[in-house]
Curated annotation (Swiss-Prot):
Predominant location: membrane
List of residues binding Ca(2+) 3: D394, D396, D398
Quaternary structure and partners: Interacts with fgfr1 that has been activated by fgf1 binding. Interacts (via C2 domains) with the AP-2 complex (via an alpha subunit). Identified in a complex with the AP-2 complex and fgfr1.
Side Cytoplasmic, residues: 1-35, 81-876
Protein name, UniProt field: Extended synaptotagmin-2-B
Organism: Xenopus laevis
Region ranges (Disordered): 1-21, 614-714
BP GO annotations: endocytosis; endoplasmic reticulum-plasma membrane tethering; lipid transport
Classification lineage: Eukaryota, Metazoa, Chordata, Craniata, Vertebrata
Amino acid sequence: MASESGAEKGPPTTPAENGQPGVPIAAAVAADEQGMISVDIAGLFYQFSKTFILIFPVYVLGYFGLSFSWLLIALVLLLWWRRNKGNKNSRLYRALAFLETEEKSVKHHIASIDLPAWVHFPDIERAEWLNKTVKHMWPYICQFIEKLFRETIEPAVRGANAHLSTFSFTKIDMGSQPLRINGVKVYTENVDKRQIILDLQISFVGETEIDLEVKRYFCRAGVKSIQLHGTMRVILEPLIGDVPIVGALSIFFLRKPLLEINWTGLTNMLDMPGLNGLSDTIILDIISNYLVLPNRITVPLVSDVQIAQLRFPIPKGVLRIHFLEAQDLMWKDTYMKGLVKGKSDPYGVVRLGNQVFQSKVIKENLNPKWNEVYEALVHEHPGQELEIELFDEDTDKDDFLGSLLIDLVEVEKERVVDEWFTLDEATSGKLHLKLEWLTPKSTTENLDQVLKSIKADKDQANDGLSAALLILYLDSARSLPNNPLEINHDGMKKAAVEKAKKAGKKIGSSPNPYVLFSVGHTVQESKVKYKTAEPVWEQTFTFFVHNPKRQDLEVEVKDENHQNSMGNIKIPLSQILASEDLTLNQRFHLNNSGPNSSLKMKIALRILHVEKPVRSPDEQHTSQVKRPSIFKGKQPPTPQMPAPSPAVAHKPPPTPKLETNKKLENGNKSSTPSASPKRPTELHKSSSSLSGSSFTYSPPHLPTKEPTPSIASDISLPVATQELRERLRQLQNGTTLGQSPLGQIQLTIRHSSQRNKLMVVVHSCRNLIAFSEEGSDPYVRIYLLPDKRRSGRRKTHVHKRTLNPIYDQTFEFSVSLADLQRRTLDVAVKNGGGFLFREKGLLGKLLLEINTEDAAKGWTQWFDLTEDGTRAAASS
């Protein structure tokens, strides 16, 4: 579901980045509108010079009256010289590249190869023994597949249509190359004790030959090769204390697999440009209807009573995605061959398993605001991840602007995540998301609270955010009428009865029943069961419900063969609210149908409620800092164009950056260093947007510089320390200085084990010393000792003429938690100085040895600055 927001509160600001201050969004948009198009002057001058050099010789020839042959001779000589020189240079460059960068080129080549998952992820096992087993079993697997095609699929196709009565498979050969399992992952955390969950990274590249023929029309077609790559989940549950130990086996894909098919015969036209992608998409949709979540294949190994719950899976939760806004996106639209830079027309594609949502397109804006809301079902976790991609809409092909991959396990723990995320695979850009984890509850105690929170008015029973989730399991039907004349015509129109009587030959044939379900504006359809009055579907359907007190479930059984209704029923959802455990499991008699016609269904209603975060009391103040760990990088898949979801009213929360500045300013106005401990919760909340929004990720394909030692003299060497002590004595001048004579600095320090990085957030400084009569121009420089190379240095921006600067900037250091105990954080506050009149100098220093236990939890603290950093008293 999608919605557009109403009015916003307060002027939101952009989050701080590495070395960049936060900027008000209104100011950024105003500046962006003023500079709609920026011209590359250097590029324009280069283009003009190049054109002049090409035209000027022609002018000289005409001016002196020379023959045009001179120009041709000069051109031939120039081409010969450039070709000769180019060959020599290319040989020389290849030799130098081979000698100097052999190791780098090999590493780059290995990184570009699509290696198996077990190479990149330590929790995925290679399991080569499994591939050897599959290879040994492959001939017998091929025999089973051939038997399945000939004895099951072939008769089904023949019976589907009279024109296909001569359909047959002439050749079925799966090839000699077996299915390969590139990695196996077994989940041990967040898993029920009575189940085993395995993820198999499967890959099949085979010379498969499947030929078919319809003799009646002399039509031949087939497939000559198939490639299939994807992640298949296998669930063994429930585990029982009797043979065969496992009650059932469930198999499904977490997301759509990658599929490539080469056709032959008549179907070879599907390989034509434009049709090849369409044919693969149609086949993938067919696979999704059977094998991609929420669909699955369940193989019972014990009695049906023990696995009845597997046929009626309740989703683990519902993820409400507030797709709010983005900032500093890359520009993709250019003019005059790139000399004039334009804007982008951004839109977003959100994927969760088999569910796809697309936002509206914002024209010519690098800071778009969508303010839309989507609701997606989470059927399995761990394993399912939220994928978000941004694109620039173009007439030919949409350009990629960045992507995100978010782990839903962390979102479930936090319940509500409202952060700015740095886009992956992009040179710039941030995305503002608010994620809410809604837990399905089988009680109505929170229903009134939920209805009030989503503003479920009586006149809007079918629109808006969802208050409940309806899960329906369609089992079977009994005693359906074989033809329209057997239907109980009470309540039916006379014209409909006469139309049924005129059906002629169709009256004597068996029905092809299917079921239509509708809740509000949402309609879902079951599969068609051919030539039967006792159909068995065993399908599950889910509906989002806005107001269960006022909405109804409408069910209608229809006959595809006779094109008529076979019965209907209307079930008020309030009836389910009054039932035990909010569940109905019974046979429902059909109206306007046969005398004994009924549907067997199991219907459950679950109230969607946001629970409190799942964390211990010790983690309550550090939960905000933990949020960036849910971000991971990922290569973007090819975008699809799904239909946009319906709009729902939504009002975005104010940007937390404003609260940060206000709280820190209040802290600066206070003269007591212990003012902040009175409200530790606010202090950690103020740093949430900073720690969550400024974490950057360097894509592997972007150019990076080799680390080189810093040749610039470090100002916090003994000479600078002596100057600082002298300045401190001058300030003292016979008076007694306070507890922190050089001032204090506020830092948030946390280590992310998932990303293997140390995050340091520089919030602010207070009560710094004045470097001159006009004050100081302070900035903060950070090293993680013993690394003092230029590449290991981190710097904030410079604040002019202030002794209480506010930075709110986040920096990252790549270091493991085990190695962190041997490292020291070197923080120096320095005076930036001017170009001619001021000199740089040291304002204070801090040397901090980080405890690994504290770093894993994360903490925020004020630290005293000293002359050499060795005496570091701290206040909370």
